[in-house]
């Protein structure tokens, strides 16, 4: 709900597959609305991997957030990871040119997977860390989410990266050199 405070003129839509998580967020939104907050926030229960393309039109989104996604540790389940080459095409379609894709996790292997796939995609370029120091959304994903606070309590590490949606064909050749992404 922190994002609804940071971006009061934007609609904040959370998409989640787990019914329990949706119920918790719905309850928090309801409580926040009683206090006059979170009027621009909602959560929908859906399978993003099946239905994302049905929710958004081309260039509709300014920002996307992938916060503490399920790492699907088993190699046989890596295809279920929310960031992969196939779904990055959908995300690039919905994200406007110049829009930002924020990722954060406490699992180094997942971070490496996400950055490898985003680095390899022709429609995303990484935003340098120096540009993010004052970004309130970047700060919020590190400090304001329940999962981020849990990682802090457990003295864990957080790994974050932000990518900008770029115009077709504008990615530098050196950044798109041939590589195998698994």
Regions found by a protein language model. Give the residues of each.
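Conserved SAM-binding loop of SAM-dependent methyltransferases across substrates and taxa
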Residues: 1-9
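Conserved SAM/SAH-binding beta-strand->alpha-helix loop
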Residues: 18
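Conserved class I S-adenosyl-L-methionine
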Residues: 76-78, 100-121
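Class I S-adenosyl-L-methionine
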Residues: 110, 114-182
